[in-house]
Amino acid sequence: MKTISIRDDVYRKLLEMKDEEDSFSDVIEKLLKRKKTDIRRYFGVLKDSEVLDEIEKSLNARKSARFRV
């Protein structure tokens, strides 16, 4: 076990993130794991999705729209 010093504002932010049963080490560990998340693991999750179809329709509609002044 080690002792570290942190600023008061950082302590308050960690405290806000902390669940009652969590230790501060748990909170810091969760934050470190988030940083390591590889965005490539989400590649293709919307494939064959109706949501993706709607997004594509919206983008195409925006591209073909003309500005009115």
From Swiss-Prot:
- What family is it from? Belongs to the UPF0330 family.
Function according to Swiss-Prot or TrEMBL: Possibly the antitoxin component of a type II toxin-antitoxin (TA) system.
So where does this one cross the membrane?
none
Q: Name one Pfam family in it.
A: VAPB_antitox
Matching entries from InterPro entries are given as: Put_antitoxin
Q: What is this protein called?
A: Putative antitoxin AF_1481
Per UniProt, the keywords (alphabetical) are:
Toxin-antitoxin system
What HAMAP family does the record point to?
UPF0330 (MF_00794)
